[in-house]
């Protein structure tokens, strides 16, 4: 079998690609830098990468009727609560 330089390099590149893909499928990513450890995999508590839960934010809107009231909306279904506003007239 006579191989030209281009054919031979193509065959070698193909086998190297197959070898690399099969090695990546066999070795998990955790072992790329040594043996994975449960505690060392977790970030430090003061780290920027520590898990932070998003704060529960409420959508605030104002409705203008007889008097302006500010409402706060929580949750997926949009439960509405009166946050600020007067339910009774001013005492004089």
From Swiss-Prot:
Signal peptide span: 1-24
Propeptide residue span(s): 25-55, 87-92
Keywords associated with the record: Amidation, Cleavage on pair of basic residues, Neuropeptide, Repeat, Secreted, Signal
GO biological process: cellular response to carbon dioxide; negative regulation of nematode pharyngeal pumping; negative regulation of striated muscle contraction; neuropeptide signaling pathway
One annotated Gene Ontology cellular component of this protein: extracellular region
Keyword Transmembrane: no
UniProt-annotated location(s): Secreted
Record carries keyword tRNA processing: no
Superkingdom of the source species: Eukaryota
Major subcellular location class: secreted
Chain positions with Phenylalanine amide modification: 64, 74, 84
Tissue expr: Each flp gene is expressed in a distinct set of neurons.
Family label: Belongs to the FARP (FMRFamide related peptide) family.
Function of the molecule: FMRFamides and FMRFamide-like peptides are neuropeptides. AQTFVRF-amide inhibits the activity of dissected pharyngeal myogenic muscle system.
Protein name: FMRFamide-like neuropeptides 16
Gene: flp-16
């Amino acid at each position: 079998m006579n191989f030209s330089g281009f054919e031979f390099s193509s065959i070698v590149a193909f086998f190297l690609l197959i070898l690399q893909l099969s090695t990546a499928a066999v070795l998990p990513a955790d072992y790329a830098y040594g043996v994975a450890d449960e505690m060392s995999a977790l970030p430090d508590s003061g780290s920027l990468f520590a898990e932070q839960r998003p704060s529960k934010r409420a959508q605030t809107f104002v409705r203008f009727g007889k008097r302006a009231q500010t409402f706060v909306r929580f949750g997926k279904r949009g439960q509405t609560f009166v946050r600020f506003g007067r339910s009774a007239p001013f005492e004089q």
